[in-house]
Amino acid sequence: MNSTDSVRHFEQKGSKLLKEFRDFAMKGNVVDLAVGVIIGAAFGGIVTSLVGDVIMPIISAITGGLDFSNYFTALSKSVTANTLAEAKKQGAVLAWGNFLTVTLNFLIIAAVLFAVIRSLNKLKQQAEETKSPPPTPTRQEELLTEIRDLLKKGAGPSP
């Protein structure tokens, strides 16, 4: 095989591989997944804002102005700071207030997804219940069914 044949062989293989990849990438499932990931990322930002800008301030107002994001426990005696950012600079800290906020984010996302999926399942169930009943058999189908049933019973025509 000379170099020209080798180049042609690799071009054909590459073209076939590129076509297979294009077919895979253009399948509905891959495109749907990409859209889902993009929407999910945007939804994550909305939930983060909901928790940080709406829910946590309400909880903070109820609890007398507590800001959970700065709650931490120092794991070293050298940590003397009052804010989480400063405490992290001074040494090891257990940032449990931040963990609480992230946990609330998760619970809200899970609750919203549960509500959406539950609603979709109810709509799907209602759609299945409202489907029209199967069509009544035609006269020809009824006669064929009767003939079949008679043949099964062995009551065919007498000679």
From Swiss-Prot:
Membrane topology: Multi-pass membrane protein
SUPFAM superfamilies assigned: Gated mechanosensitive channel (SSF81330)
InterPro entries assigned: Mechanosensitive_channel_CS, MS_channel, MSC/AndL, MscL_channel
Lineage top rank: taxon: Bacteria
Transmembrane segments: 35-55, 97-117
Subcellular compartments: Cell inner membrane
Keywords: Cell inner membrane, Cell membrane, Ion channel, Ion transport, Membrane, Transmembrane, Transmembrane helix, Transport
Record Pfam families: MscL
Cellular-component GO terms for this entry: plasma membrane
Gene3D superfamilies according to UniProt: Large-conductance mechanosensitive channel, MscL, domain 1
GO terms of molecular function: mechanosensitive monoatomic ion channel activity
Major site of localization recorded for this protein: membrane
Family per similarity comment: Belongs to the MscL family.
Annotated PANTHER family: LARGE-CONDUCTANCE MECHANOSENSITIVE CHANNEL, MECHANOSENSITIVE CHANNEL MSCL
Subunit structure: Homopentamer.
Function text: Channel that opens in response to stretch forces in the membrane lipid bilayer. May participate in the regulation of osmotic pressure changes within the cell.
Protein name (database record): Large-conductance mechanosensitive channel
Organism of this sequence: Rhodopseudomonas palustris (strain ATCC BAA-98 / CGA009)
Gene name, Swiss-Prot/TrEMBL: mscL
